[in-house]
Curated annotation (Swiss-Prot):
Organism: Monkeypox virus
Chain positions recorded as Mg(2+) binding sites: R28
Record lineage: Viruses, Varidnaviria, Bamfordvirae, Nucleocytoviricota, Pokkesviricetes
Expression induction: Expressed in the early phase of the viral replicative cycle.
Top-level class of the enzyme under EC nomenclature: hydrolase
Binding site for dUTP: P72, R73, S74, G86, V87, I88, D89, Y92, G97, I99, R115
SUPFAM superfamilies: dUTPase-like (SSF51283)
Any Gene Ontology biological process: dUTP catabolic process
Cofactor list: Mg(2+)
Listed PANTHER family: DEOXYURIDINE 5'-TRIPHOSPHATE NUCLEOTIDOHYDROLASE (PTHR11241:SF0)
Listed transmembrane segments: none
Gene (UniProt): OPG046
InterPro entries tied to this protein: dUTPase, dUTPase-like, dUTPase-like_sf, dUTPase_trimeric
UniProt-recorded name of the protein: Deoxyuridine 5'-triphosphate nucleotidohydrolase
Top-level lineage group: Viruses
Length: 151
């Protein structure tokens, strides 16, 4: 029922700007793909254990009540490449950059036009926060960090 709280037309296009001729339009690789691939606009070299901000030279407006989540590509994850950060706020209009982290043992090269991450649009809820003295209790309580896993 929360879906109806958001007065949003899911068929409205998301507007984006290619800031340079090096930019490549975000694309989905299949009709059922959750994310739109983002592409590097430049060449980069990322040594093992280092991170690099990768420029896409794309800016866009997020739909109302949505944010963009920058997620890793599974093929890059297999090579030890991960994403740092990863939230594009609804009101952000600047250039989209992707922080790649090389957790692998070899230098990783990014070439112009390489798919570096995927952008997933997700609805967001802006609750009012209320400070209280204590929270209601649950069976789980404060047990976290693997407490519900196998023992």
């Amino acid at each position: 029922m929360i879906f109806f709280m958001f007065n949003m037309n899911i068929n409205s296009p998301v507007r984006f700007v290619k800031e340079t001729n090096r930019a490549k339009s975000p694309t989905r690789q299949s009709p059922g793909a959750a994310g739109y691939d983002l592409y590097s606009a430049y060449d980069y070299t990322i040594p093992p254990g280092e991170r690099q901000l990768i420029k896409t030279d794309i800016s866009m407006s997020m739909p109302k009540f949505c944010y963009g989540r920058i997620a890793p590509r599974s093929g890059l994850s297999l090579k030890g490449i991960d994403i740092g950060g990863g939230v594009i706020d609804e009101d952000y209009r600047g250039s989209i950059g992707v922080i790649l982290i090389n957790n692998g043992k070899c230098t990783f090269n990014v070439n112009t036009g390489d798919r570096i991450a995927q952008l997933i649009y997700q609805r967001i809820y802006y609750p009012e926060l209320e400070e209280v003295q204590s929270l209601d209790s649950t069976d789980r309580g404060d047990q976290g960090f693997g407490s519900t896993g196998l023992r």
